[in-house]
């Protein structure tokens, strides 16, 4: 049995947890735009790509020799930063862009500290190898794919989708285009379509990781839990240090009512990427509340707000934390 405060917090958290799965953030008219000035540590040359975590967007740049990079005219949102360094592979980290982190001129300073364990070396090998199917992709389809990336940088989702659909018409084996189409469908809340597109991407390239982990996510959203468990276990075994795979496996166990296993993988995700856009802290807090562990619930909610200071329901969450501490 829960105390009233804990029970009320459980209801609020359940609502918040539900909405993070389907809410697509959008910029209000006249919303401030931000400049992100970042640095990779240890310093070195790298390519840096910024992906929208909750809506379709991507843009890329290169660092200078000291590891510095910048992105301008960014909307307030959650983003995934993907850093690729030759010889090391790719590492990903979630960042927040918003008023709490910016100065008076809407500039945000960021240092991304990366360890060797953060990089996926397989991504380096993939960039230096080309399959026969990829060699068969015509140049016109590749142009469509690149045009789609430029469309996403301009927030023109409809144009990006049209270019990608044309790309897969020209080259049905174009797994990367199918995966991007799936991501767009997921982020625009067309979940069954996202599932079909991720499956098509995997059909064309069964060894590809991105559509595998993305399929695992949409299966959780669609509550196809038996297959979600199978897919997300596979993803975590393929990349044990991927926060997304660990978080999704934790969510799957949560939905199955296997809370001990859920905590294991949600905590792992939180350690790997404390600001991760899947918000593992909200699931952890709900588990702690169901167990009557009010202090633990308050602790993970405070951790969540530390990494998401501009979260829309932050004030409600702060009141919940005060109640849980009483």
PLM region spans:
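Helix-start (N-cap) detector for alpha-helical repeat units in TPR-like alpha-solenoids
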Residues: 141, 175-176, 209-210, 243-244, ...
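Short, acidic Ser/Thr/Gly-rich low-complexity loop/linker segments typical of extracellular
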Residues: 54-68
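Alpha-helical segment of the N-proximal tetratricopeptide repeat
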Residues: 133-176, 180-183, 187-193
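Structural signature of tandem alpha-helical TPR/SEL1-like repeats
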Residues: 153-165, 187-200, 221-234, 256-268, ...
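A short, solvent-exposed beta-strand micro-motif common in secreted/extracellular proteins
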Residues: 77-87
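Canonical tetratricopeptide repeat
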Residues: 146, 180, 214, 248, ...
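Short, ordered, surface-exposed loop/turn motifs in non-cytosolic proteins
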Residues: 34, 41-54, 126-128, 142
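Structured interaction patches on ligand/partner-binding surfaces of diverse proteins
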Residues: 61, 86-109
């Amino acid at each position: 049995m829960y105390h009233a405060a804990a029970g009320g917090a459980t209801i609020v958290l359940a609502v918040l947890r539900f909405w993070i799965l389907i809410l697509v953030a959008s910029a209000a008219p006249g919303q401030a735009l931000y400049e992100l000035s970042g640095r990779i540590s240890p310093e070195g040359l790298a390519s840096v790509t910024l992906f929208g975590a909750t809506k379709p967007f991507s843009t890329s740049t290169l660092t200078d020799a000291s590891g510095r990079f910048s992105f301008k005219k960014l909307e307030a949102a959650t983003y995934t930063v993907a850093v690729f360094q030759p010889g090391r592979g790719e590492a990903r980290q979630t960042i927040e862009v918003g008023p709490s982190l910016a100065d008076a001129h809407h500039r945000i300073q960021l240092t991304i500290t990366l360890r060797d364990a953060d990089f996926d070396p397989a991504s380096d090998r993939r960039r230096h190898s080309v399959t026969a199917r990829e060699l068969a992709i015509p140049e016109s389809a590749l142009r469509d794919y690149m045009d789609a990336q430029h469309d996403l940088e301009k927030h023109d989702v409809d144009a990006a989708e049209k270019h990608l659909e044309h790309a897969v018409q020209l080259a049905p084996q174009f797994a990367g285009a199918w995966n991007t189409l799936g991501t767009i469908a997921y982020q625009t809340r067309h979940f069954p379509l996202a599932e079909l597109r991720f499956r098509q991407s995997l059909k064309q390239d069964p060894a590809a990781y991105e559509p595998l982990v993305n399929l695992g996510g949409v299966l959780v959203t669609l509550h196809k839990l038996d297959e979600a468990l199978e897919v997300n276990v596979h993803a975590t075994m393929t990349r044990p240090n991927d926060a997304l795979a660990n978080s999704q496996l934790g969510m799957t166990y949560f939905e199955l009512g296997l809370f001990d296993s859920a905590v294991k993988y949600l905590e792992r995700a939180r350690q790997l990427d404390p600001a991760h856009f899947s918000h593992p802290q909200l699931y952890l807090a709900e588990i702690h509340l169901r167990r009557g562990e009010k202090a633990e619930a308050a602790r993970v909610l405070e951790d969540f707000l530390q990494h998401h200071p501009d979260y829309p329901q932050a004030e409600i969450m702060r009141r919940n934390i005060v109640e849980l501490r009483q």
